[in-house]
Amino acid sequence: MRRLVYCKVVLATSLMWVLVDVFLLLYFSECNKCDDKKERSLLPALRAVISRNQEGPGEMGKAVLIPKDDQEKMKELFKINQFNLMASDLIALNRSLPDVRLEGCKTKVYPDELPNTSVVIVFHNEAWSTLLRTVYSVINRSPHYLLSEVILVDDASERDFLKLTLENYVKTLEVPVKIIRMEERSGLIRARLRGAAASKGQVITFLDAHCECTLGWLEPLLARIKEDRKTVVCPIIDVISDDTFEYMAGSDMTYGGFNWKLNFRWYPVPQREMDRRKGDRTLPVRTPTMAGGLFSIDRNYFEEIGTYDAGMDIWGGENLEMSFRIWQCGGSLEIVTCSHVGHVFRKATPYTFPGGTGHVINKNNRRLAEVWMDEFKDFFYIISPGVVKVDYGDVSVRKTLRENLKCKPFSWYLENIYPDSQIPRRYYSLGEIRNVETNQCLDNMGRKENEKVGIFNCHGMGGNQVFSYTADKEIRTDDLCLDVSRLSGPVIMLKCHHMRGNQLWEYDAERLTLRHANSNQCLDEPSEEDKMVPTMQDCSGSRSQQWLLRNMTLGT
């Protein structure tokens, strides 16, 4: 029996080394130019081959399911970082991941002489397992000759294991890992600036502290910067479940935009961008904005373009500020579809903001609007009137930067880079739509696409009660338009399609009526059955069918 077990072990070991030999033979047959000094992608690829034989929780990106007996403990641990800490701690720090790249990406060959990079990771009270899994994924899946260093910036963490224990641990890793300590809680923006200032690489790559890099993630980013140093590049951001840590591939068919409130949003890649790439999905996507957590930028260009706005606090808005600045000042922003990095997306943040989240984000957004949005800032202020009340500090240095860089106006950005923007360039009215009879206002109620528009007491605080009556005669709330598909309604909010039809409304500035062209009915007050939604009725000229549109300029 023992002899049989021994034979099986020998056979299994032999098979594994045969596979390694075959891999090496195939690799070097394609790599005549490789030298010993530059390992190219050999070690990361070899690690990936070996990792496919690993078994254990979360391997190959599979979900980790916690037994029922441990559910209560799991829920308590979840509160610490707002993700399933129990699941994360069960997963190996160097777990294997699936290769989620497009097939065309797997055969791409990149230049030998690529710039190297410093990877800057900011953390604050991060979990040990997610932080170290981020670091390991960078080291194990990056050619070391391209990896100048990993810089961990501790934004005043309070947990003991992130002090001396972490310092001693990173000394054992294969590449230089430097830890920088912020003296006080400074936020992502200032911590990244500190890390960038200490970096030595030709390129700076910023990552969040709960990421996992996949095979071949780095070379496509650096190759694109080598082609054009003024191109700022982002990987496709894959989703790591905050509940199970399952690894799910992100889409190469989405890119970054923003809504009326200047919140970053993902939108489908438009047909014009597909046409520009001639249908080749392995080519980079030009994106109007970036999510901001994960990107690479030439270190000198980072300085030339103005780094981050140091007047912004913590985080929020800095990604749009940098996106506008890059495009308006002669650079470009791309999603490199052959690069994949996973990110733990949390439903809530475990951190508190000095002054509150709303105050911080309002200040940051006010700064970016004042410097970069020109006359379109007034549109944003109507949507978010609370922003105007915030002390946003001195932006004269940033305005001087814009002048020195000879940056283009925001209208150029909307017309040339983001023509699909939800901001209407021409509109007759922007603000509340108030019913004369009830003195109530249309309200989107925070509802989503394919739900009914509501009506509520007017509050004068913008937000959900801001509608635009556009030059195309749509009634818009952000990227949704009021749509009526049948007689007597209901009035539904659907994606604006710009094809008129069910979304065409005629406003009579004398009678104050909003007539739906297709049904020939008028928007009316709510019925007794549901006092929270407007109705569609035959036009009668009654006060209940009269609506006051704020700042109405019909005919301009």
Swiss-Prot record:
Q: Which residues bind Mn(2+)?
A: D208, H210, H343
The superkingdom of the source organism is Eukaryota
User: Which membrane topology describes this protein?
Assistant: Single-pass type II membrane protein
Residue ranges, annotated region (Catalytic subdomain A)? 114-224
Matches recorded under CDD domains:
beta-trefoil_Ricin_GALNT13, pp-GalNAc-T
Q: Which GO terms describe its biological process?
A: protein O-linked glycosylation; protein O-linked glycosylation via serine; protein O-linked glycosylation via threonine
* Family from the record: Belongs to the glycosyltransferase 2 family. GalNAc-T subfamily.
This molecule's function is given as:
Catalyzes the initial reaction in O-linked oligosaccharide biosynthesis, the transfer of an N-acetyl-D-galactosamine (GalNAc) residue from UDP-GalNAc to a serine or threonine residue on the protein receptor. Generates GalNAc-O-Ser/Thr structure also known as Tn antigen, which itself is immunogenic but also serves as a precursor for the synthesis of different mucin-type O-glycan core structures. Contributes to the synthesis of O-linked glycans on mucins and proteoglycans of the central nervous system.
Protein name per UniProt: Polypeptide N-acetylgalactosaminyltransferase 13
